[in-house]
Amino acid sequence: YELQIDFDRLRKAIGDEYVVLFSPHYFIANSIDLSKYEGFVINVARYDEINELYLVSDIIMTDYSSVFFDFANLKRPIVFYMYDYDLYQSRLRDFYISLDELPGPITRTQEELEKCIINIETEFPKYERKYEDFNKKYNYLDDGNASERVIKEIFKEAV
């Protein structure tokens, strides 16, 4: 499998300010050698709890994974890297939601991705309204009271 991201180039572009926690799809996780990127890219494919990785992440960069739904609860930047969107849509499947609803920039080239990460502090505010709308629509139950609602629902007949 050939990665569609050049980590050497990314490192040059964004410098040592970031460490990439790379979670490849399980189909390819064992076929990727990231040893030459030690200190910059860490393969976290075998890490059991992705929610813990969200907590230590400043930005999430994803393609078509649904991870952004959970990450959006943190109200941190989400960058979509859809280098093969046309192929993905025509041969595999459509996306979960309309691209217009995505709470972050869509990048299609490595150059766009790099620029977006470098300028994240000015890019992220441009998506504030979409972010709010996205969370209202898809994460509205994540208000700190979800467990209480579940307990009440389970035990409502017992009370």
Question: What positions do the PLM features span?
Answer:
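Aromatic-acidic/polar surface patches that form glycan- and anion
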Residues: L3, I106, N139-D143
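Short, well-ordered alpha-helix to beta-strand connector turns
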Residues: E17-Y18, S57, K75
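Conserved catalytic-core segment of nucleotide-activated headgroup transferases in glycan assembly
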Residues: Y1-L34, T107-T109, E148
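Short, contiguous acidic/charged loop-to-helix segments that flank catalytic cores in large enzymes
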Residues: N43-V44, E49-N51, E101-G104, Y140-L141
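Catalytic binding pocket for nucleotide-activated donors in carbohydrate/polymer assembly enzymes
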Residues: I32-G39, S66-Y138
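Donor nucleotide-activated moiety binding/catalytic core segment of transferases
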Residues: L21, Y26-F69
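C-terminal alpha-helical cap of glycosyltransferases
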Residues: D142-V159
